[in-house]
Structure formats: structure tokens, C-alpha cells
């Protein structure tokens, strides 16, 4: 609690003669601030230590010190774990039990400046505690609301409230607990049945709209990029048949079964892929020319992107 004793270094020393002597010595030290920097003499250091001890004694002996200590502990308890909270409460009880004494500042009115400081600092700590507590309260309220919404969506019961009138019943209501449980079960069953009927009714009423939305979504999806898995399967086939990347109709059927695409999408993908990333080698061109010029009698047909070449 050292920070509670050093919070007001400017407190005036009212009361006993010892305090006045210490204050005069401290003022003498403050008055010599313009002297060249050098280590203070031992007497000045002792006087400053005595002044600090006197300030601590005045704060600890003030009638408002228990309130100041309680406000400080309340600030430290915000967000603290249970074991730390218990320890802080014990410290607070000890401080309230041992606070107050026959020191120089033991009565209100002897030192108005100290009285004003103690009152002001208590108010500051109380406002600070409110600011610290507000985020925790907002977070707890948000979590409670989310829990209630999830429970309502899942068909479960809402979280229990803290209302003591609802949680605690009288002895006259105890004999009827079985009837109350049966009534609650019946109400819960009827509410679930009503929810199921409502879902069925909405599904029947809007099933056509849902089907149209699904078909429109699939159309838009087809117009966009192909799925990643489908493109991977097509690229695997492309890399395997890179020398002649012209899938047959059987290949297209197999690829359609693997990717879930229709043959038109597969055909368009291969056309675009060949235009962008494939160019036949010189040997392939020579073989194609031989097939065109000398292979007409065999009845074969060569397929290209722009059409067909054959008999």
C-alpha cells in the first residue's frame, strides 16, 4: 500500500510541533533548489525521511483513510481472479480494523487541505472503478444476449435469471412441484410441436422461391470461375496429355463425372487453355500436315479449335 502513502506530497503539516519542525526543514530544503547539484547533507536526508513518515502517518490516521483504502481495493478487484479478490478483501478488513489513530491528522478539520485531498481522491477512485467496471458489464450483457439467441435458435431453454422471486418458492408451493414439472414439460412439448409445424408450413410456402434462388445461384456460379477441385482435375489431365491436349468424348464424360461440370464447361476450358498455354511443336505440325495431305484415304478426321479437317 506504499502508493496510498505517497499520493499527496504537498500536504501541509498542521498540528504538533514535531510536524512543524519537519515542515520547516522541508521548506528549507526546497528553498535551496537553485544551489549547484551536490549530495545533500545527512541532516537534510534525515529531515526528508521524517517528513515522508509524517505524511504517511497523517494519511493513515485520517478518518477518511478507511474509505480511501476501500475505494482503492475496489479498483483492484475489477477483473481480478477469485483468489486475488479474496486476498484483497482480507487486506481491506485488516485496514478497516487497524485504521484510525491518535496521530496529528486524526480528526477532520485540523488540516483542511488534507481533508479536501482525501475526499477528492476517494471520488476519483470511485469514478475510476466505474470506468473499469463498464466494459466488463457490457461484455457480460453481450454474452447473455448471444446465449439467449442461440438457445432460442436451437430450441433450448433460455439462461436462468437472477430474480430471487422466481428462483425461490414458498413451502406452500412444494406439494405441487410434480404438477408444475408436468405442466412445464407439456408446454415445452407443445412449443416444439408448434415450431415444427411452423417450419413445415414455411418450407411448403417458400419451397418454390428457394428452388429458384438455388438455380440462379448455380447459374451465377457456373458463369464465374470453376471450382478449385474441378480446375485441379482438369489440370492433371492437361499435364498428362500435354503433347495432344484434345480430350475425346469419353474423356469429357469421365472428367464431367470427376468434377461435376457439364461437357460444355469442360470443352470451353480446354479451348481457352490451348489458346493461352499450348503451342504444337515442329514435329507435331509436320505430323499434322502429313495426316492432312496423305491420310485422307484412311477416313480419319482431325479436330481443331476452329473446326475439323478431314474427308
UniProtKB/Swiss-Prot annotation:
Residues 12-22 have a biased composition (Gly residues). PROSITE patterns: ELK, HOMEOBOX_1, HOMEOBOX_2. The keyword DNA-binding applies. Residues 197-217 form the ELK domain. The keyword Nucleus applies. Pfam families: ELK, Homeobox_KN, KNOX1, KNOX2. Keywords: DNA-binding, Homeobox, Nucleus. It is found in: Nucleus. One of its GO terms (cellular component) is nucleus. Residues 218-281 bind DNA. GO terms for molecular function: DNA binding; DNA-binding transcription factor activity, RNA polymerase II-specific. Residues 1-45, 153-184 are annotated as: Disordered. Belongs to the TALE/KNOX homeobox family. Probable transcription factor that may be involved in shoot formation during embryogenesis. This is Homeobox protein knotted-1-like 10.
